[in-house]
């Protein structure tokens, strides 16, 4: 328990590399502790070469024990962090000290290298396991969404650099636990929350430095993906770059008659008018460009297919007939039938050439339309020479590449995100605050200010009002102050500013229905080069229809490893001569049947070699529905198929419980768990944690007892075994025949017989009878995606008294249902919020279920809208 000193102070001790403590460090000075969000912490301090022992100055025994690569245990802010000593500097001066320099314990990964690692289609758990294999660090918690994504890696670096590449690739936030030697991976919005803390000159702030760097602003971003792909085909302007001049346009505003209401701080009115006019043109005609490009791409695909067929007709089939005619003539055989075959084949060749010519003509026409549209959407032509020169002053150009993205649609969407993060000067604020962790009156803030938290900084003199991530903390324990760095945030905007900003940029192109690409070039490995000339179609795999094709194993952290098996003949026939199988997987909270290709951005792909008949997806969420598909493939030469591959159909399981497959209705956790549940740390171990954080829940697996650490002590929140009743321990002396019968888990499972009159010193009348104890209220919640049907029924395990349905979309309203006769929706009136409805069109309650709206408005069940529901039963 770290309650012997104030959280704002620091305790240090020295340990060997196995963490065995060998000395407390009582005499130290000039401590500098730098904490960094999503990176390594560092620590430095001085210790004297001599120390006072019983009023005598003697050589400091700690200085003698100090070694590089030993460990330092630091206790501060009710936390424990381990550091590795990376340097010692001995100074023979007036003070005679040793400066000790340390890095966070994960620094040891810098000393171990990965050479030529290649991982294809790996989720975060798989690639992180490869990275940490054989090291002291293990994987802790992984947000389930990261195991539903797959990325490929080609790395030669230190293990720490590799680990950093992993979390950056998956856009995860690493959290190192140097006590348990683990690294966990969270979504940023999970660890970065605004807890209502504000720094200002009136509150905590000593001084402040707010840096605005225009060099960091980007208004034009050139975007490329894997193998140089660009966004022209999905960008409404048809360009390979994105523009956003909103920072320099603000606060320009005009009415519908083009009268200027507010001038821009930077741009002339003529230029502002021209940019807004251009945006309106792009919003109006940009979709036409996308449609034309899709038509051209489809025609080019058709052309390639027909050219392949022409090659087969002309260079293979016709040539075979001509060879037969030559042989027949030399042998003096009749060639009449062969000549008929030749003439018929020549007619096929002529027809195929005519078809290709027609497609070429269509491609030419569409190309001309595209060029005309490009000309109309050319910003340079639209602005003219004079305005183009004015705009050039505000074009801050940069390049952005993401080699993990091979699909134009995903690249376009990620490019928009990147530009939105760089279209204004980044937040870079450094401020010194008082060390409030030493002030008992500020105790309420102790667990609300730490790395990753979002802090609001307000300074009226600087006109600063910003919410940003607390990315760094430097403690000066001698001066009782903390230097805080805040970054990666946005300057506060009013609603008027937010609305104005939507006018300054073109609308995002709708990409919801775009077919996304599969990275076949990376996924499909040529395991068998001897079949590259086989042009025969590939046979379909088969999946047993008896419910045994899919199985799963529950991991200690509650995730599951799901395996699917299939069948495919081992045969030398061409149709069975393949390179491998591509496993498709889609997960959802809905039990609806899924067709592959519907939401390709949410699909996972895994490639296995031709000799395998089973594949396993690791670290998946246990209470989701999984749809699997198996596809056989053969990689071939381009002359056989221009795509370089021949694919079978995607075969899905047909057994009802396997299409889709639900591993479990809930998340089952066993063994040792370290992770967040509803914002709290949950740990399930036989031994009670020694240095818990506030809010830690400990579950004793022996008796299922739960205890919550409130920052000072453990509080029992529930008990699996009956050790007491209403706080009184059962008395066996006053009531001789009181015999509790427990099962192997420690839970009372038998009845208590005899004539006992007392229990825990209380008479029977002091205790309530079961029939007099009120039944506790029931509650359930869940998520579903609307399918557009009327009166959709959602089953429950109890009959509800009240149901709330909240859409995660502005396309629908929240429903409040408290009757079998109908529900209500909120409406905004001049006096505030009120309810409207009262009929079945707004949903209804039922026995062990609730029902969504019954009319054509489909309230509570609009197509593709996601809903969160809550059901209550009051007793």
From Swiss-Prot:
Keywords: Coiled coil. Transmembrane segments: none annotated. Residues 537-648 form the Fibronectin type-III domain. Residues 351-381 form a coiled coil. The keyword Coiled coil applies. The keyword Coiled coil applies. It holds the Pfam family DUF7361. This is SPbeta prophage-derived uncharacterized protein YomG. It comes from Bacillus subtilis (strain 168). The gene is yomG.
